[in-house]
A protein has these predicted regions:
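Glycine-rich, aromatic-lined ligand/substrate-binding cores of catalytic
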Residues: 55, 286, 290-294, 298-392, ...
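Long, intrinsically disordered, low-complexity segments
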Residues: 20-21, 117-120, 192-194, 215, ...
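Short, surface-exposed recognition loops and adjoining beta-strand edges that mediate ligand/DNA contacts
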Residues: 32, 60-82, 174, 204-223, ...
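Conserved, well-structured interaction surfaces
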Residues: 38-47, 51-61, 85-165, 178-191, ...
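Membrane-proximal, proline-rich intrinsically disordered regions
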Residues: 20-74, 103, 249-250, 525-539
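Flexible, polar/acidic helix-loop-strand segments at domain edges
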Residues: 90-102, 351-431
Length: 539
């Protein structure tokens, strides 16, 4: 795998876009040497931003670590939970509160997520300033292309910030002053992201980002097209500035300008999904190959976090966090015996019936665990048997407190992994074409069209029978196909299911208003910038 250039760059880090200013370590290198030619400007002002896509620090990275974006999009849903197992996994009520939607503005992990997202946004603004101030060393084409790529990265991070926090500040200048910073409505942030991506997409390389080479791990045109499809699919949500009043626009009445044509949200989503098909993406014949140790040549994966245990410190925690201690030990490392699938999730896969979905064994460890064809034995001499249907949010008094719940699978085990299985060679899949097909199917159905071709292409790939293309089946298929990929919260919100009761979760008082579909603005940010208003329901 190609190395993504590492760098240390002096930069005032304006966390929360407030007077809270931290400074990154000062670089001892001569600034003029760092930016003395086009190659160095690209490495240190553009490529350097990709250092932050993944991480080995809690609450940082778009995926791979714990207590961050992925956990708040997965462990707050009917897909998965991190149950209390006696003396393990209470953690001050963190995981139980996450599952029960009992977070608040003082949640330190939400604050850390906010800091992470805006750190990269601030650094992107700095990079744009650097490119502009050194454009005499660049050709007009280089200035255009470098600027476009940085703006696309910034839009990507604004997308995650908007999706989680709704009303966030739009700041595009590196030298902004506190009195200039205001909080934008969610619809304004949505429009900003769409406009940015549509504006820069023609300047982005029309290359496959997941493949090794010059564009490996970068935001290319297909990445922008996928993100635009995702934005259009969720336009009803993102254009709603008061998500607690029970009203929102219909996607058929939300319009985009797409290549000079006026299209509604669903037509826009379909158009961008079709662009991905034209760009050469297709389903892999083997579903599991997208998550193999060496998955960098997948024809289906669109955007990934490149991992290489010999080059990067970035980590993938989810297998390590989920497997029983003895299970991890059988691979020569360790594990934390934590997260697992909810009962409703394994039942959706048909577990316990004669009609188990063919993706079940790829996505989960269940029943008697075998490694290299051999059973794993617990300290009491009994074989390790995961019990998917015995899961409870608090297992402290359960006979199965150590073994309840089907565990995270999906990614092939890297048998040469470092750090107890957290540093691996499997690239982390963020965007893939299988999701695009399901988005296209959903958009067609919502637009009054037939989405059966796209929906059943997904099922054909794994040898499952065709189903009718309706919204219920599409939501279920998104769980079956995309489990453990970090999309469930967004899907449940879009389908109006996120605030309802499921798997030992009772809705909070007033949660029917939808206030928990957006996380609170961290209190530290409110304290530092009095112009900010708290999100609805958390006042």
């Amino acid at each position: 795998m190609n190395t993504i250039i590492k760098y240390i760059l002096a930069a005032p880090l304006m966390l929360c876009f407030s007077s809270c200013l931290d400074e990154l370590p000062k670089d001892q290198l001569d600034q003029e040497a760092i930016y003395n030619n086009a190659d160095n400007i690209y490495k240190n002002a553009v490529a350097s931003l990709y250092n932050y896509i993944g991480s080995n620090q809690e609450s940082e990275g778009l995926q791979g670590t714990c207590r961050g974006i992925y956990d708040y999009n997965t462990l707050t849903t009917d897909e998965a939970m991190n149950p209390i197992r006696g003396g393990d996994w209470y953690d001050g009520g963190l995981w139980e509160n996450m599952y029960q939607h009992k977070w608040n503005a003082n949640d330190i992990n939400l604050y850390n997520v906010w800091k992470y997202l805006f750190k990269v946004i601030v650094l992107s603004n700095q990079s744009l300033s650097i490119i502009d101030s050194h454009k005499t060393l660049l050709s007009a084409e280089q200035t255009r292309d470098f600027t476009a790529e940085v703006r696309a990265v910034r839009a990507l991070f604004y997308y995650y910030a908007m999706d989680m926090f709704g009303r966030v500040p739009i700041v595009t200048s590196y030298d902004v002053k506190l009195e200039q910073v205001t909080q934008s409505e969610r619809s304004e942030v949505f429009k900003f992201i769409v406009d940015e991506l549509q504006d820069v997409a023609p300047q982005l390389a029309d290359e496959h980002s997941n493949k090794e080479g010059d564009y490996y791990g970068r935001v290319t045109r297909p990445v922008a097209n996928f993100l635009l499809a995702k934005l259009a699919l969720n336009a009803e949500i993102y254009t709603d500035d008061n998500w607690t009043d029970g009203k929102r626009q219909d996607g058929k009445s939300i319009y985009f300008n797409v290549n000079g044509e006026k299209k509604n949200a669903w037509e826009t989503c379909i158009w961008y999904c079709e662009q991905l098909r034209q760009e050469g993406y297709e389903l892999e014949s083997d579903y599991a190959s997208n998550f193999a140790v060496h998955n960098e040549n997948s024809k289906e994966n669109i955007f990934t976090i490149p991992l290489d245990k010999n080059l990067y410190l970035n980590e993938y925690h989810y297998l390590f966090r989920s497997r029983h201690y003895k299970h991890g030990g059988a691979y020569g490392g360790s594990s934390e015996n934590g997260t697992c699938a909810t009962v409703s999730t394994v039942k959706a896969f048909g577990y316990g019936t004669d009609n188990v979905d063919n993706r079940f064994k790829i996505n989960f460890y269940a029943d008697t665990v075998l490694v290299d064809g051999k059973k794993i034995y617990l300290d009491n001499g009994k074989p390790l048997v995961y019990m998917p249907l015995e899961l409870k949010l608090n297992l402290s008094n359960s006979t199965y407190k150590q073994t309840a719940g089907a565990r995270v699978g999906k990614y092939e085990v890297d048998r040469t992994a470092y750090s107890d299985g957290r540093q691996v060679d499997n690239d982390i899949v963020l965007f893939r074409y299988g999701d695009a097909l399901l988005m296209e199917a959903e958009a067609k159905v919502r637009n009054g069209e037939d989405g059966s071709i796209e929906l059943n292409a997904i099922r054909d790939r794994v040898g499952m029978p065709h189903v009718e293309a309706n919204l219920d089946n599409i939501l279920k298929e998104r769980l079956l196909e995309l489990v453990w990929e970090g999309w469930r919260r967004q899907d449940l919100i879009r389908f109006g299911e996120y605030t309802k009761a499921y798997d030992q979760r009772t809705p909070l008082e007033k949660e029917s208003t939808g206030f928990t579909t957006v996380f609170p603005i961290p209190q530290r940010c409110l304290d530092l910038n009095k112009k900010y208003k708290q999100n609805y329901g958390y006042e």
